[in-house]
Amino acid sequence: EQGVRLHTRHRWLGWDENGALRFDTPNGEMLKTVTTTLLALGGGSWARLGSDGSWAPLLESRGVEIRSLRPSNCGFIRQWSPFLSERFAGQPLKQIIASTQSFRGDDISRRGEAILTHDGLEGSLIYALSAPLREQLEAQGEANLTLDLAPDHTQDQLQQALSQPRKGQSLSNLLRKKAGLDGVKVALLHECLSKEAIADATTLAAGIKALPITLTGTRPLDEAISSAGGVCRSALDDSLMLNALPGTFCAGEMLDWEAPTGGYLLTA
């Protein structure tokens, strides 16, 4: 009704020497001369759904400034012990607070749920902190994350509860009753704290409230929900037209903007 025509199984190949758009089609290469072009080609994640970032070198060859595509809304890598990885991978860390610092040193905290994977952490809570965590990785080779495993208890409350006689209870049972920690949270404490820290009520309570997790990498770009990087803001005017290519506009995940989600969820 609006005059829009959809051409499926067409891949944009850039421009020919006369500025016409080139397309690879089932019937061979097609050229199209236009006055205005809107590029909305996605980022670089989930290439099998079409957004493979192959447009980046095409624009760079025309003088458009591009920041390299990196994972965003993604999982992060931490090499766990075989016991934790084999026993608890895939289990949720529910009702926790995750904290880190921005590149400028600002404290950032979010409450929610994360998933312990066989080689790290993922889930909506981790995705929400993916930008500052990735920036730390790029700057120093590792990222520092702190988990509060019992956000509804103060450290003093936990210390007092854990200082009481166990009366034959195991530590796991005591932590479940007094701090509300399930098996995966208890296992994570044993993974990240020393035996001496676990045995002392003061350091154990501190660890429950601020468990340090060092992350060593991101999951691959192709697994990320979205990608950071893309066409730099300085390469665009206020209408999102490319300064180097008048009449050509860019939109969506192609832009260098840290979006809260990406085309993968729209497609899925």
Predicted regions and their residues:
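Hard-cation-handling environments
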Residues: 253
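A conserved short coil-to-beta-strand element within the FAD-binding core of flavoproteins
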Residues: 8-20
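Short beta-strand to alpha-helix junction loop
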Residues: 1, 7, 46-51, 78-82, ...
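Central beta-strand plus flanking loop segment that forms part of the substrate or channel wall
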Residues: 55-98
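A structured beta-alpha segment of the ubiquitous adenosine-cofactor-binding alpha/beta core
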Residues: 12, 24-31
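Short loop/edge segments at beta-strand edges and connector loops
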Residues: 6-10, 68-70, 219
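Residue-level recognition of phosphate/Mg2+-coordinating polar/acidic sites
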Residues: 22, 36-40, 46, 97-248
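A conserved FAD-binding loop/helix module that cradles the flavin
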Residues: 42-62, 242, 257-268
